[in-house]
Every structure is written in C-alpha cells, then in structure tokens.
Amino acid sequence: MSDTFNAVLPAEWAPQSGIQLTWPHAGTDWAHMLTEVQVCFAAIAREITQRELLLIVTPEPEEVKKQISATVNMQNVRFMECETNDTWARDHGAITMLDSEGASLLDFMFNGWGLKFASDKDNLITRQAVKVGFLNGRYVNRLGFVLEGGSIES
C-alpha cells in the first residue's frame, strides 16, 4: 500500500454540482434579528439559483418555501428537512476531495467554536445528506477530528 495520497481539494472556482445553505431559524444565534437575516439568505438563494442547484437544510422546509418561492428559481432548489443548531455550513458541511475514483465527502467534527455553542445537530447534517442522496460521493467519517471555521487552506 502506498503512502501517497493523490487527491485534490477543488479550488473555489472549480465547477461544482451545487451549494448548500443551512437556513436560519429561531433556534439559531440569529434569533434577535431573524427576519433581517432570512431576507438576506433569500437574496443569496435567489442569486445561487439563477446559476446552479441549491440545497437548503432546514427544520422548516414549508416555512422556507413560503419565504423564497416568489423570488427564487424553485426548479433549482432542493430541501432537506433536518434539525440544525446554526447556519454555518462552512463549519459543518462536507469537504469534497477528488481523486481518480471520484469524490470523497469528508465529514469532520464541528465543536461550536470550542464548545461555546451546541453543534450536535449540525454534526448530523453531512451524513444525512449523503444517506438520502443530496450529496454524491464516498462518505468518509472523520468526526473524530475537529475542523471548523474554514480552518484549512488548499
């Protein structure tokens, strides 16, 4: 077996199959300004769906549909109903690595910025998204390793 790891972390500008947003709700740290933040997320969703697929992770898909359906290209939206602690997909989402066999979806531990905030629900999102087919690739469990806040560089 070789010690060489021949995989790449795709650049930010590389072609992608879509974008994930984890939607703000009353149980997130946005509660004090929820309406304002949801309007901002709706504007982000509108821009994304003009160009590519969007996966919205939310415990309230019907509520989010009401918020965005008038302004967003709903043909490019997929909803995954899932309990969440917060909105930071960069912290709890999969990290995709590409090799000769295709995509590997690395699922790292998010610990809520050093256990400052709950993150137990967020740590289930990637695994569920792969299980139900919203994310395609080989699931790689790395939940024993804390990696959050965009704390990697390629």
Mark where each language-model region is.
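The feature marks the mature, well-folded catalytic cores of soluble enzymes
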Residues: M1-S154
